[in-house]
Amino acid sequence: MIYDNRLLKVICAPHVSEKTSAVMEKNNILVLKVDKKATKAAIKQAILQLFEVKVKEIHTIIVKGKTKRHGKRIGFRSNWKKAYITLYEGQNFTLINGAK
C-alpha cells in the first residue's frame, strides 16, 4: 500500500508546451513533470503500473526555477524535474480521453 502511494506521487503532471507537443507528435515520447527526488527506475515503474504502457528509455532534466519580480520584491520559483519518456513502437498513450 505504501509503495502504491509513492508511485502516485512520482508523476505530478503532463508538461504541455510547443516543444513538447512537437516531440509527442513526431516521436513516441511523453513529457511529464515528476517529483524532484524520483529516480528513472521509479518513474518507469509508475508509468508501467498506472498507464500500462511499456517504456523504452527515460531522460530526466532538472529545470532551474526562474527569478520573478513584482515591483521591488524579488521572488523565486522552485526547481522541478522533467522526464522525457520514450515508448516502444505500437504503444499509444493519451492523457485526455476523448480529446479532439
Swiss-Prot record:
<dbReference type="GO" id="GO:0005840">
    <property type="term" value="C:ribosome"/>
</dbReference>
<protein>
    <recommendedName>
        <fullName>Large ribosomal subunit protein uL23</fullName>
    </recommendedName>
</protein>
<dbReference type="GO" id="GO:0019843">
    <property type="term" value="F:rRNA binding"/>
</dbReference>
<keyword id="KW-0687">Ribonucleoprotein</keyword>
<keyword id="KW-0694">RNA-binding</keyword>
<keyword id="KW-0689">Ribosomal protein</keyword>
<dbReference type="GO" id="GO:0006412">
    <property type="term" value="P:translation"/>
</dbReference>
<dbReference type="InterPro" id="IPR013025">
    <property type="entry name" value="Ribosomal_uL23-like"/>
</dbReference>
<dbReference type="InterPro" id="IPR012677">
    <property type="entry name" value="Nucleotide-bd_a/b_plait_sf"/>
</dbReference>
<comment type="subunit">
    <text>Part of the 50S ribosomal subunit. Contacts protein L29, and trigger factor when it is bound to the ribosome.</text>
</comment>
<comment type="similarity">
    <text>Belongs to the universal ribosomal protein uL23 family.</text>
</comment>
<dbReference type="GO" id="GO:1990904">
    <property type="term" value="C:ribonucleoprotein complex"/>
</dbReference>
<dbReference type="GO" id="GO:0003735">
    <property type="term" value="F:structural constituent of ribosome"/>
</dbReference>
<dbReference type="Pfam" id="PF00276">
    <property type="entry name" value="Ribosomal_L23"/>
</dbReference>
<dbReference type="InterPro" id="IPR012678">
    <property type="entry name" value="Ribosomal_uL23/eL15/eS24_sf"/>
</dbReference>
<keyword id="KW-0699">rRNA-binding</keyword>
<comment type="function">
    <text>One of the early assembly proteins it binds 23S rRNA. One of the proteins that surrounds the polypeptide exit tunnel on the outside of the ribosome. Forms the main docking site for trigger factor binding to the ribosome.</text>
</comment>
